């Protein structure tokens, strides 16, 4: 492999998606680099969150949704009929816009996934502690693991949700505007965490925050009207965009 080649483990080919009659994603083809952060940017309604949800088949939950094309994860089309969606979502974890802890203890939130996947008590405990460490939360909650998750601050709840996702040992992490409901200090902690996690995980993040995309992502895709207008290294997208619409969006002329 040449120095210019990049390993990818998510490969999208000719992806089209409809909600009823609405053509929401149009002929999307994209190769997402592994163990790096790819940001999806664009104005509201451009298709970036819809696209993100295609990567672990969350759109299956929308009755009016129909999809054509391929989404390959490690070479396997996740839309093949024989794909186990539960296993897929274990491998491709998602963290949502607002923290959504389960109504149970901090410990049980993280233990839930390993338990339902058949882990022993000792392995579950090991995974809980590692996930809390990896989510940079252990130091803040180690003496209160039995407390209700809702007793945590918003930023802590979001890191708890990240830890819960990590506990089932995914390969890929999807973030749908994970900081939009958080204060600047909590946002900074999440960003630092994402930069640390990319050493071991492929990360795709939807964000409306251009500064955030510039700070934490290695590559950026600009969406508009259900299409990818431009994709490349974040530095190039922000400093030397090739399309006028990309430049207009990044500089705040529309959005």
Swiss-Prot record:
Main location: membrane
CDD domains: ABC_PstB_phosphate_transporter
Positions annotated to bind ATP: 42-49
InterPro entries: AAA+_ATPase (IPR003593), ABC_transporter-like_ATP-bd (IPR003439), ABC_transporter-like_CS (IPR017871), P-loop_NTPase (IPR027417), PstB-like (IPR005670)
A Pfam family of this chain: ABC_tran
Function noted in UniProt: Part of the ABC transporter complex PstSACB involved in phosphate import. Responsible for energy coupling to the transport system.
PANTHER family with a match to the protein in the record: ABC TRANSPORTER I FAMILY MEMBER 17
Protein name as it appears in the record: Phosphate import ATP-binding protein PstB
Protein source organism: Methanococcoides burtonii (strain DSM 6242 / NBRC 107633 / OCM 468 / ACE-M)
């Amino acid at each position: 492999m040449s120095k210019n080649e990049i390993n990818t483990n998510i490969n999208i080919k000719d992806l089209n998606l409809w909600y009823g009659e609405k053509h929401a994603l149009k002929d999307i083809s994209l190769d997402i680099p592994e163990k790096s952060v790819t940001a999806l940017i664009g104005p509201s309604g451009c298709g970036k969150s819809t696209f993100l949800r295609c990567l672990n088949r969350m759109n299956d939950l929308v009755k009016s949704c129909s999809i054509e094309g391929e989404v390959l994860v490690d070479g396997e089309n996740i839309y093949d009929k024989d794909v186990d969606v539960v296993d897929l979502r274990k491998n491709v974890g998602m963290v949502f816009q607002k923290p959504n802890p389960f109504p149970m203890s901090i410990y049980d939130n993280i233990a839930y996934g390993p338990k339902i996947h058949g882990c022993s008590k000792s392995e579950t405990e090991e995974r809980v502690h590692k996930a809390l460490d990896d989510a940079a939360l252990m130091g803040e909650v180690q003496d209160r693991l039995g407390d209700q998750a809702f007793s945590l601050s918003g930023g802590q709840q979001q890191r708890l949700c990240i830890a819960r996702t990590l506990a089932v040992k995914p390969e890929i992490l999807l973030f749908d505007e994970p900081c939009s409901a958080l204060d600047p200090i909590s946002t900074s902690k999440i960003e630092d965490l994402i930069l640390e996690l990319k050493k071991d995980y492929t990360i795709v993040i939807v964000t409306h925050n251009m500064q955030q995309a510039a700070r934490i992502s290695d590559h950026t895709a600009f969406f508009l009207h259900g299409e990818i207008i431009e994709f490349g290294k974040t530095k190039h997208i922000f400093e030397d965009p090739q399309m006028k619409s990309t430049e207009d969006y990044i500089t705040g002329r529309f959005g």
